[in-house]
């Protein structure tokens, strides 16, 4: 007799079977993969004992090289060797070219889907990232002796929907099953929180190769709650290298544009000097120029500090803003966790220590801590460890909402709301007989549509024809654990429904999230004034339309003088509602309401008379 194996959802049918899972830190400069074995999380090395895989892909004739082998070709074959693809993922061509003008690549494709021309043809950043994920997946299979059930991939907390979706697309292309996308700072908190049993408020300072994130978390009995996040989606150790390259170009008397190989050589020397100066006071630099001559110089730690100090200060300003968002003072922060290879720079560590007035935690390798945290979470998600041991609560970086009449934004999910989350609000129709509604989904902190970012649009059709305001349309916003948004709209009486998964065509501009938040603060008073004006204008339009419809239906209840008074009041309201004076619109609305009071009474009396006509008194 055949037997059915029964198990709880997400758990193995074999009681003590250990499922293979891994955590991947898909980094800008380097990537790692880690797994939990015998209860301990550790990074997995390749056949040469190397944990770190450089995030570099080189497209050669009939072959794709990844990691160290690709890195060796980054100078001599710069156009076919792609580095820091994470910086390009989910971005428009215009954004890439304006932010990174010295990239040695030949771009093609359309504005919203840029591609890089290589020896093997055009490739996009998603395909490049997929090659890195493939390599890490093969490493894990070799190290663990089997196929992975799934992986947790980390992303910067500031990655928007486009960048997160592109990361999932890369995993799908690589044949990797994604259990969850996890914010990098949260992954670091998982690693430190579970290992050291910390409880209280912790700041996670994450400075990687291409992104900076600061997260304020509250850890309590295994619950990780992100109170607020901030940072810069285009600031990292690569920027330290860029300012150092600019300095070397100036010192050597070079004039741009330079050859791709010379640009890459300068970048490698800058990176080498930065790394050497973490332990040395001075380093020698040699550049092989295109003229076949060498240019030599030296760089001191003091010179490096001077060059990068403005960038370090930029990260500290983001720390202050994020603490304010979390409503937390510096004194309440009990620990500061350092994440990312760029936190090895002595100036970064000393300035962070000075800012928070405490020595940062660096006991776990800052290059590995994110991958280790992701591995721990992956182990939980495949059922190797009870979910009750750990709960992760990430947050939305910007408010999500939709457009209402007058170009106003109604926020449905406020900024810094814990995810996953689902929130719904009810809306109604503006006009009599309206049978469709356009739903415009927006992201941002401002009050007007024109000042926020458009994410998606869809239509709800088939709404039963009713008088304005009678229909009840329930709009639901859902953000899943990966930070991806879906929106649905349903008319309650008929059940007609429409929905959309938000997949923007490209990501936010550099600093856009921080800039949007700053703009909302600096323009708060003006925005509220503009919102109040728009609301009064919409109300004026609604009242005028309603009164005109009533006149069309029941003008017989009024004499000519009364009609003239109402029509004059309508004209007056229509005229002032075109202006900018809120009080004038309010006064004109009051005047129209007063002039139609008798009309409203007569319409009510007429409706009652019609309803009672022909009925016996004893049945009323």
From Swiss-Prot:
Any GO BP: iron-sulfur cluster assembly
Origin superkingdom: Bacteria
Cleaved signal peptide residues: none
InterPro entries xref list: ATPase_NBD (IPR043129), Heat_shock_70_CS (IPR018181), HSP70_C_sf (IPR029048), HSP70_peptide-bd_sf (IPR029047), Hsp_70_fam (IPR013126), ISC_FeS_clus_asmbl_HscA (IPR010236)
Molecular-function GO terms, alphabetical: ATP binding; ATP hydrolysis activity; ATP-dependent protein folding chaperone; unfolded protein binding
UniProtKB keywords: ATP-binding, Chaperone, Nucleotide-binding
Gene3D superfamilies in the cross-refs: 1.20.1270.10, 3.30.420.40, Actin, Chain A, domain 4 (3.90.640.10), Substrate Binding Domain Of DNAk, Chain A, domain 1 (2.60.34.10)
Function: Chaperone involved in the maturation of iron-sulfur cluster-containing proteins. Has a low intrinsic ATPase activity which is markedly stimulated by HscB.
Family indicated by similarity: Belongs to the heat shock protein 70 family.
Name of the protein in question: Chaperone protein HscA homolog
Organism: Colwellia psychrerythraea (strain 34H / ATCC BAA-681)
Source lineage: Bacteria, Pseudomonadati, Pseudomonadota, Gammaproteobacteria, Alteromonadales
